[in-house]
């Protein structure tokens, strides 16, 4: 949880950089890019942190089976593919839960809008998440997307 909080703090510090990247990627007006795009990513991140502080990753099955447990475990390697039109929104909706649940992930942003995802990669690195947990690949959907979605070591695909 503390790494996500560090990430969130760094995200807010790089707000203008993220906004500028979105303007370049989408041609979005500055207010739209800042408030709705960058702001949405911040809001999602903050909401996930708040939710995860209360989430029980292990709990009893129920009153009828007190010795049996429900244990939420990482899914494994996740391939996360995001579109160009909501770059930060989709990145945070995919990356933050994967980080929080302990999954290793490969993020492939749209080839039309990779800049904001590159900043997210920098923030994850700066927050000191373990090396190899987050991986960023750039490329087109036909080649890179196909490689990710057909790889036998990928346990989950989010598109």
Regions found by a protein language model. Name each.
Residues 57-159:
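Rossmann-like NAD(P) dinucleotide-binding subdomain of oxidoreductase/dehydrogenase enzymes
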Residues 1-66:
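N-terminal Rossmann-like NAD(P)+-binding subdomain of aldehyde/semialdehyde dehydrogenases
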């Amino acid at each position: 949880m503390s790494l996500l909080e560090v990430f969130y703090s760094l995200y807010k510090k790089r707000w203008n950089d993220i906004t500028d990247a979105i303007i370049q990627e989408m041609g979005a007006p500055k207010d739209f890019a800042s408030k709705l795009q960058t702001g949405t990513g911040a809001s999602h991140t903050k909401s996930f942190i708040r939710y995860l502080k209360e989430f029980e990753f292990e709990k009893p099955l129920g009153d009828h089976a007190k010795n049996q447990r429900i244990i939420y475990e990482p899914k494994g390697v996740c391939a996360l593919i995001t579109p160009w039109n909501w770059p930060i929104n989709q990145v945070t909706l995919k990356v933050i839960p994967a980080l929080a649940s302990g999954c290793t992930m490969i993020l492939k942003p749209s080839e039309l809008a990779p800049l904001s995802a590159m900043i997210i990669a920098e923030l994850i690195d700066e927050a000191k998440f373990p090396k190899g947990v987050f991986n960023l690949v750039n490329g087109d959907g036909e080649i890179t997307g196909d490689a990710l979605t057909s790889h036998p070591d990928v346990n989950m695909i989010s598109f």
